[in-house]
Amino acid sequence: MYRLAAFDMDGTLLMRDHKIGSITLNALHQLADAGVTLTFATGRHYLDMKGILSHSGLNGYLITGNGTRVCDAEGNPLYGMDLPAELVEFVLRTPWQTNASIHLFRDDGWFTDRNDPDLLIAHTTSGFHFQLTEWDELPLTGNHKFCFIVSHQELVELKAQLEQQMSGEADFCFSATDCLEVLPRGCNKGVALEKLSHHLDLTLADCMAFGDAMNDKEMLSRVGRGLVMGNALPQLKQELPQLQIIGRCEQQGVAHYLHHWLSSPHLTYSPEF
């Protein structure tokens, strides 16, 4: 019996309308009623997630910013990592050869110097929005992560530039095909979940996790049972071939799996693609 379940949000629980489906909500409530601790592990900001969970009538532990912050169900901070100030300064002052927009995340919000209202569509449920700013107006300390947003091919080229210039001072991951994240060295959902598990007197072997993108890789590979969404990025499926693939997000594949696990955990699971 797993005692904690960790869920990615976009592409795992959140459907195309950026909401959790009713069947999935029902399954999550059943899981909590069965005594399993709910944890939501996402690249989204804490303020964004609190709005989503409040709207959905859910509560649980939060791993946000792809592992840069861990909070309990009341919002009390349990763990955090920030980017080094000198790295933040370097990223903001370097003229990168890219058309990507740059986004910086701090405890007090999401900051960018480019106004792109289309990015707000994914945050309509919570009302979370970016704050337009001049980069030199922000402190260099207290920054969780950067996101670069543009087409995937441009991001692949940008990632090569960043890795060459930063020489192991940060970690990089694709949270979506069009979103490249720069994170503190050694920071990911897997490390954050390990910290949370220790806080709860659990081990990662006591946990199951669900995800669809490369920012889920460490979490999925380290838990007792990692489940890969049918709609997951091909690279994730290729790098974690040992893990079971379940249904797609739009089919509420997490709910289908949880209903099976809660009712017949001893039987082999067969997804409906």
Swiss-Prot record:
This is HMP-PP phosphatase. Catalyzes the hydrolysis of 4-amino-2-methyl-5-hydroxymethylpyrimidine pyrophosphate (HMP-PP) to 4-amino-2-methyl-5-hydroxymethylpyrimidine phosphate (HMP-P). NCBIfam families: Cof-subfamily, HAD-SF-IIB, PRK15126.1. PROSITE patterns: COF_1, COF_2. CDD domains: HAD_Pase. It holds the Pfam family Hydrolase_3. Mg(2+) binds at D8, D10, D212. PANTHER family: HMP-PP PHOSPHATASE, PTHR47267. The active site is at D8 (nucleophile). Its cofactor is Mg(2+). It comes from Yersinia pseudotuberculosis serotype I (strain IP32953). GO terms for molecular function: 4-amino-5-hydroxymethyl-2-methylpyrimidine diphosphatase activity; magnesium ion binding; phosphatase activity. Keywords: Hydrolase, Magnesium, Metal-binding. Belongs to the HAD-like hydrolase superfamily. Cof family. It catalyses: 4-amino-2-methyl-5-(diphosphooxymethyl)pyrimidine + H2O = 4-amino-2-methyl-5-(phosphooxymethyl)pyrimidine + phosphate + H(+). Its EC number is 3.6.1.-.
